[in-house]
A protein has these predicted regions:
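Conserved small/polar residues in nucleotide/adenosyl-binding loops
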Residues: 229-234
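Conserved alpha/beta-hydrolase
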Residues: 22-39
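A catalytic-pocket lid/entrance helix-loop region that shapes and gates access to the active site
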Residues: 97-148
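The serine-hydrolase catalytic nucleophile loop
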Residues: 11-18
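Short glycine-enriched nucleophile-adjacent loop
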Residues: 83-94
Length: 234
């Protein structure tokens, strides 16, 4: 099983790490970190070589090399951006592996896709659950004058800096909240009631939607680079 990781591979070094397909088939596991992530960040960094095509040639090189040792069936698999990589790998090198199994792999139609917002607003979960999420977002906006100082202090304590005013970051974080909640599968019953105190609301808000995503210290510079320059074209 070849895992086409879309990000860093550090978590796969844990002794107890197991990937679903290798466990099901009792198969050998090869875990490939995406270039420019984790330990695969070059120094000095030249972003010109961070392309989808180059990442697929990385996988091709790994697979063709290891096939000299392992000549049985091969499965490529990945999750999210890694799932995208599984699909792209199959497209570029259709004969490298026998089976491709992408999980939750988005296929972007453009830089701004446009399908996410209607889905979150009208289709995900139940109308009652969607309303509870929306009510929380509205409450956090209504209390902005009281919660914004807490938000600003939190970001300052974390050392976050932004290229836009902190009040706008707050608003973006509120908008991001619904996507983050559904993405990570947070139970709706974990959302505080709208009459909860400021501290309770703020604690939940930050736990679900960490503002480092918008900061200049974003932990995903490589993701931002490849998403803007290459993934939008696929």
């Amino acid at each position: 099983v070849l895992v086409t990781e879309g990000y860093a591979a550090h978590y796969a070094t844990h002794p107890r790490y197991q990937e679903e397909l290798s466990k099901l088939f009792n198969a050998n596991l090869v875990f490939v970190e995406y270039r420019y992530f984790g330990e695969s960040m070059p120094k000095p960094c030249n972003w010109d070589y961070l392309t989808v095509e180059n990442s697929l040639y990385d996988l091709h090189h790994v697979t063709t090399t290891l096939k000299q040792l392992y000549d049985e069936k091969w499965i490529a698999t990945g999750i999210s951006k890694g799932g995208q990589t599984t699909m792209f790998y199959r497209t570029y090198f259709p004969d490298d592996v026998d089976i491709s199994v992408p999980y939750v792999a988005p296929l972007n139609q453009s830089l701004e896709d446009g399908r996410h917002e209607p889905f979150i607003a009208n289709k995900v979960s139940t109308p009652e659950n969607r309303k509870r999420v929306e009510n929380f977002q509205l409450e956090v906006l209504k209390r902005k004058s009281r919660l914004l100082p807490m938000f600003e202090k939190y970001c300052s304590d974390k050392g976050y800096t932004f290229r836009i005013p902190i009040a706008e970051v707050y608003d973006f974080n509120v908008l991001e909240y619904s996507f983050a909640l559904w993405q990570w599968g947070t139970p709706v019953n974990k959302i505080p009631e709208t009459n909860a105190d400021d501290h309770t609301l703020f604690k939940h808000f930050i736990a679900i939607c960490e503002p480092d995503y918008f900061s200049e210290q974003s932990p995903y510079p490589s993701f931002n680079a490849v998403s803007y320059t290459h993934l939008r074209a696929h």
